[in-house]
């Protein structure tokens, strides 16, 4: 088939890029590999398509692992994300994409785990030379996973799924710091974990309860960073998470100003935010 023929060409070009140490050839091979499904006639089965993308992504991770060309992984995630857009954006309409989206969601979990493990192993094995690449990879991976969960995962399970992935990324953040003592990957994966915690919380709560929960989570995050890194500068940067409860507290401030009650939920929300900031 056309896809197999393209795959043979891609394999040859990838080997040549490794043999002669030419990253430009690797990027060309990657583009050919990810564009190949678009060149086939007719509609490609969704499971076959994402199985193919998964195989190409694993091959990309292997090539990046032996060459150190980490930007290949970022481009790989970008292409997978582009193929995912129709399944995420069209899920609320009756089409072949919406029918296949719940199945492809499982592939999204596999992709995210692969990219996460790739980043962690790179940090543990030899450290990270280009922090910007790891930060971009972590952010894109988190955004990719967030969009899939938000648009496709069952609403009644979304908070639990966000919380579970928050634990996974938090563990990745801790592992990256423990074995490298580098703050860049710690911040990158930790930021994704914090975003997922916030997403899980916002799904379940609203109003003053959400402000209180965000303030408590921000305080807990700050304490965890201080205990893990024992670095006041790192804790100072982590204090940026207080932006979210502070911004949300403005609505509680307006509600409390217009309320006749003294000891209301909005009062305790404002009190907790004020104490946490002190």
Language-model regions, residue ranges each:
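Extended, compositionally biased regions that are outside compact catalytic cores
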Residues: 1-191, 196-278
């Amino acid at each position: 088939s056309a896809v197999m023929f393209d795959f043979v060409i891609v394999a040859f070009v990838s080997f040549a890029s490794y043999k002669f140490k030419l990253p430009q050839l690797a990027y060309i091979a990657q583009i050919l590999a990810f564009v190949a499904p678009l060149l086939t006639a007719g509609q490609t089965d969704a499971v076959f398509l994402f199985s193919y993308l998964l195989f190409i992504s694993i091959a990309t991770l292997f090539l990046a692992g032996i060459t150190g060309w980490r930007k290949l992984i970022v481009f790989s995630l970008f292409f997978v994300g582009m193929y995912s857009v129709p399944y995420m954006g069209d899920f609320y309409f009756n089409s072949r994409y919406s029918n296949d989206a719940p199945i492809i969601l499982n592939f999204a979990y596999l992709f995210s785990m692969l990219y996460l493990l790739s980043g962690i192993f790179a940090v543990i094995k030899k450290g990270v030379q280009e922090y910007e690449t790891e930060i971009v990879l972590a952010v894109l991976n988190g955004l990719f996973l967030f969009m899939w969960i938000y648009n496709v995962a069952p609403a009644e399970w979304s908070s639990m799924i966000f919380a579970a992935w928050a634990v996974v990324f938090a563990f990745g953040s801790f592992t990256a710091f423990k074995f490298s003592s580098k703050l860049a990957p710690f911040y990158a994966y930790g930021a994704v974990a914090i975003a997922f915690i916030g997403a899980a919380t916002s799904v379940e709560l609203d109003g003053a309860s959400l402000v209180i929960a965000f303030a408590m989570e921000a305080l807990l995050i700050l304490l965890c960073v201080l205990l893990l890194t024992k670095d006041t500068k790192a804790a100072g940067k982590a204090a940026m998470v207080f932006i979210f409860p502070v911004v949300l507290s403005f609505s509680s401030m307006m509600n409390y100003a217009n309320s006749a009650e003294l000891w209301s939920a909005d009062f305790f929300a404002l009190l907790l935010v004020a104490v946490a900031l002190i």
